[in-house]
Amino acid sequence: GAEACECGIKLARTWGRRIAGNRKITLVTFHNAFHGRTLGAQMAGGIPALKDWIVNLDPDIVQVPFPDGFRCPDTRFELFLESLEKLGVKPESVAGVMTETYQGGNASFAPPEYVQKLRAWCTEQRALLIFDEVQAGFGRTGTYWGFEHYGVIPDVICCGKGISSGLPISAVIGRREIMDLYPPGSMTSTHTGN
């Protein structure tokens, strides 16, 4: 799963750089998010204690509140925009937004209207909407993909766990123009697939 999320981060950055060079490299993720235990996945994650070992965090990976109505009672989409402004992030600099379908063992979901507005905002900004479906995908929430509860279609889906019934396999799914940013073989390592 972490490797799939790393690939999602790489695709977002590459996508942004194709559009606007190094002016469009910011990745927005959410407080309390967990995207894995590798370097990039932990920087994208929203749990500060898991980042203590990382000496130099990437300043272009930022977290905003996750609107679950519990830890963050403010579920307005405007909070997303206000948070970016507070962090000094210009909308046009955002290459991608990565979110889990739900957070944690208690399955905290965002309101569907929030996610629908986020989808529209990403489209307007030419930023990729990336769903980390490692925990929620393959029927775990009652739909094949967890994001189906929101009535949106992401640009990139990072998935694992349920894909293989326990084998260490993950996948990244996306539109052709995103997935073709790298030629075959260039996103793999010694023992991974392509």
Where are these regions (language model features)?
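Conserved N-terminal phosphate-binding loop of PLP-dependent enzymes in the Aspartate aminotransferase
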Residues: 1-194
